[in-house]
Amino acid sequence: MKLLHLFIAFLIFNFSFLIPLKVLPQQTNKYFKVEVQKDVFIETWFLLYLPDGYDTINQSWPLVLFLHGSGERGNILEMVKKNGPPKLAEFGKSFPFILVSPQCPEDQRWSTDVLDMLLDEMAARYRVDSSRIYVTGLSMGGQGTWDLAIAYPDRFAAIAPICGKVDPGDAAKLKDIPIWVFHGAKDDIVPPEMSENMVNALKAMGSDVKFTLYPDAGHDSWTETYENPEFWEWLLEQHR
């Protein structure tokens, strides 16, 4: 009987390699080039993640634009997978939305105009639900999140800036947008007062902005945020 059990186990182990495994959605490298003036072009590489079922389910999908921090700038697109949603997707997490993760060029900051044109390109090429477009980012990308929403407040259903610099003088442009702000209380790179001052300015204008201040977190206030299912549930519940 023991030999029979061993033989069955041997068959299961070996023939299991013949059973096709479910293929997880993958992030693909994409290239975006736009003419901003006559003979003046802007080029951007980005990671594109399409949700499981995109090719088989004929529907429009939410889109999340993710903006990385300063350490991932350059021309090595794999660096964008270092943190945030691209990192989670790389390790097999399945998202129910289109994820667009561009790379900022070396020694530059996020360009709101280029990002807006990138979103136009995504809406033209893919089945994007225009009422459910979101932006989130960390550190320099948190600042980029604020800046992009300030420049194009009618574009987004919600925004989620994480430890990003921002001028509270721009609060009036954002008071009607659902916002969830995150920061570490021990952040010694971007002081938490940056977020606190903006949150207070928004609340003074009647905004129902949400604010999470992690008491023991330093600059990395994004890992806990992006790994929290409640964050994604809240984000995807928002509609424009």
Locate each region found by the language model.
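Bacterial Sec-dependent N-terminal signal peptides
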Residues: 1-27
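A domain-start/cap signature at the N-terminus of enzymes
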Residues: 18-61, 136-138, 143, 148, ...
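Active-site machinery of serine-nucleophile hydrolases
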Residues: 63, 67-118
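Short beta-strand immediately N-terminal to the catalytic nucleophile in serine-hydrolase-like folds
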Residues: 135-137, 162, 182
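A conserved short beta-strand
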Residues: 155-165
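C-terminal catalytic histidine-bearing segment of alpha/beta-hydrolase fold enzymes
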Residues: 178-182, 186-240
